[in-house]
Structure formats: structure tokens, C-alpha cells
Amino acid sequence: MAVTADWSERGEYMLARHSIHPAWANEALDDPDRVVITPDPASKSGRAVRTIGWSYTANRIIAVITLVDNGRLHGVNGWVANSSDQRLYREEDRDE
């Protein structure tokens, strides 16, 4: 089953702010080689999760922030991964 987030509340924001389409973020979430960081180091609540994965459509490594609320996975934000997140992704890929 594919991993997808509900972007109904934050998808337009992410697209406007970071030029990341929700479909690209969902591709990164569903990447079998994704890196999941729980909790996201920047999370103020400690509930957000950072996933670093590959989007085939965007042809980029994308960092995606999600939050589970009432049993549902909500997309919070996403952007092209910075050099640190890209390094984590590539190191995980080599370790396997």
C-alpha cells in the first residue's frame, strides 16, 4: 500500500512557498529507500516526523514533514532537501 499524506490543508502553502507539489511529496514518502526521522529535530511539539525521500517526478530528494492526527497522516510541509538531509539519504542508501 502506498504511503500518502492528506495535503488538503497545507498543499497549496507548500506549493506556493517551496514549489513542491503534493504528489512529489507523496512520492518521497513512498520511496522504499526513504529516511524517517522521528521526531523531526525542528518539531516544537515533538510529534512531527521528517521523511527524506526521492521524488521521481521532481527528480530530487525531498524533505517532507508529516503529523499523525486522529489516525490520519497529514502533510505539513516539504521542500528540496538541504545538503545535510541529502547526505543522510545517500548514506542510508549506501548502508544497505
Tell me what each language-model feature is.
Residues M1-E96:
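Ribonuclease/tRNase effector modules and their secretory precursors
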